[in-house]
Curated annotation (Swiss-Prot):
Disruption phenotype: No visible change in biofilm formation (in BHI-S medium), TcdA toxin production (in TY medium) or growth in sporulation medium (SM); increased sporulation in SM but not 70:30 medium. In SM medium, sporulation initiates earlier than in wild-type cells. Higher levels of spo0A transcript and of Spo0A accumulate. Increased transcription of 165 genes (most are in the spo0A regulon), decreased expression of 21 genes. 5-fold increase in expression of the sinRR' operon (CD630_22150-CD630_22140). No change in pathogenicity in Syrian golden hamsters. Coiled coil: none annotated. NCBIfam families: YicC/YloC family endoribonuclease. One of its GO terms (biological process) is sporulation resulting in formation of a cellular spore. Its cofactor is a divalent metal cation. The keyword Nuclease applies. Its EC number is 3.1.26.-. The lineage of its organism: Bacteria, Bacillati, Bacillota, Clostridia, Peptostreptococcales. Induction: Accumulates by 6 hours of growth, expressed for at least 12 hours in sporulation medium (SM) (at protein level). Accumulates independently of Spo0A sporulation response regulator (CD630_12140, Stage 0 sporulation protein A). InterPro entries: YicC-like_C, YicC-like_N, YicC/YloC-like. It comes from Clostridioides difficile (strain 630) (Peptoclostridium difficile). This is Probable endoribonuclease YicC. It comes from the Bacteria. Negatively modulates sporulation, probably in response to nutrient conditions. Effects expression of sporulation regulator spo0A in an indirect manner, possibly via repression of the sinRR' operon.
C-alpha cells in the first residue's frame, strides 16, 4: 500500500532514574534526509538512532527530536585536586608570613583558584541507555508509520479512482478514433466533389491511397494500448508494500507522453476534449504522488 511522506509520531520511556521523550515529524522530500537533534550527553547514540529511522522511513525529510533527563540521580561528580590545593595553601602561608598578614586562610580562598574543584560528568552505560532510548524511538516510529500508512491508504484510493476515470476516457478516445479515418474519407470526397465539375472522374485508387496515408499518420492504436498498460501497472503499484513514489512518477510521465502524442495526431474535437480531461487527471495524480514515499 502507498505510504505518505507526511506524518508525526511520539514515544516515551520513563523509569525511576531516566526519562526519554522522542518526537518525529516527516514531510515530503525527493530523497532521504534525516535530521536528529539530541542532547550532547547522549550524542554517541546518534548513529544507532539514524539506522533505526532508516528501517522505517525510505524517503522524505525526517526531523527527530530527543529529550533526555536524569531523575533522582546526579549526573556529575565533584572532585578536588589535593596536590594542587596543597601547593596553593603552602604559597598562601608563605605570603602571609612574609607580609605579616593576620587573616586566616579559608577554604573559600583555596577553592577560588583554577582547577582546584573539578566537575566531571558521570559516564553512563551505553548499552543501558540505548536499550531505553531504542524503546522510545521505536514507539515514535511505529506511530509515525501508522499515520503515514493511513494517509497513504487515502492517497492510493484517490489515485485508484482516477485510474478508473482515465480508463473510461481512453476507451472513449478509442471509440472515437475508429471513425476518424472514415470521416476523413467522406470529407476528402466531398471536398474533391466541390472542386470538380464532374465528380464521376474522381480517381478512387488515388483517394484510397490518400486515405491510407492519413490513416497511418493518424493512427493512435499503439498509444492507446500502451496507455492502458500503464493504467494497469499504476493500479497494481499503488497497492504494493514498497517505496513506490518514483515508479509512479515514471508511469505518469509515460502516460503524459502517450497523451501528447494522441493529441498531436488527432484533429477530432471529441478526442481533443478527452485529451484535455486525461491531462487534467494525470496532473491531479502527479500532485498526489509528490507526497508518496
Amino acid at each position: 500500500m502507498a505510504i505518505s511522506m507526511t506524518g508525526f509520531g511520539r514515544g516515551e520511556y520513563k523509569d525511576d532514574n531516566y526519562y526519554f521523550l522522542v518526537e518525529c515529524k516527516t514531510i515530503n522530500h525527493k530523497y532521504s534526509d534525516i535530521n536528529i537533534r539530541l542532547p550532547r550527553k547522549i550524542s554517541f547514540l546518534e548513529d544507532k538512532v539514524r539506522n533505526l529511522v532508516k528501517n522505517y522511513v525510505k524517503r522524505g525529510r525526517v526531523d527527530l527530536y530527543i529529550k533526555f533527563d536524569l531523575l533522582g540521580k546526579e549526573d556529575v561528580n565533584l572532585n578536588f585536586d589535593e596536590g594542587l590545593a596543597s601547593q596553593y595553601i603552602d604559597i598562601l602561608k608563605e605570603i602571609k608570613n612574609k607580609f605579616d598578614i593576620i587573616d586566616d586562610i579559608s577554604v573559600m580562598n583555596v577553592a577560588k583558584f583554577p582547577d582546584i574543584v573539578k566537575i566531571e560528568e558521570k559516564e553512563e552505560d551505553e548499552d543501558l541507555l540505548w536499550s531505553m532510548l531504542n524503546q522510545a524511538v521505536e514507539d515514535a516510529l511505529i506511530k509515525l508509520r501508522e499515520m503515514r500508512s493511513e494517509e497513504g491508504k487515502k492517497l492510493a484510493e484517490d489515485i485508484a479512482m482516477r485510474c478508473d476515470l482515465l480508463k473510461n476516457h481512453i476507451e472513449e478516445i478509442e471509440k472515437y478514433s475508429s471513425s476518424v479515418v472514415e470521416d476523413y474519407r467522406e470529407k476528402l470526397n466531398l471536398r474533391i466533389s466541390e472542386l470538380l465539375d464532374d465528380p464521376s472522374i474522381i480517381d478512387e485508387n488515388r483517394l484510397a491511397q490518400e486515405v491510407a496515408i492519413y490513416a497511418d499518420k493518424s493512427s493512435i492504436t499503439e498509444e492507446i494500448v500502451r496507455f492502458k498498460s500503464h493504467i494497469g501497472q499504476l493500479k497494481n503499484t499503488i497497492f504494493k508494500d514498497d517505496s513506490i513514489g518514483r515508479k509512479i512518477d515514471f508511469l505518469i510521465q509515460e502516460m503524459n507522453r502517450e497523451t501528447n502524442t494522441i493529441g498531436s495526431k488527432s484533429s477530432d474535437i471529441n478526442i481533443t476534449n478527452l485529451v484535455v480531461e486525461v491531462k487534467s487527471e494525470l496532473e491531479k495524480i502527479r500532485e498526489q504522488i509528490q507526497n508518496i514515499e
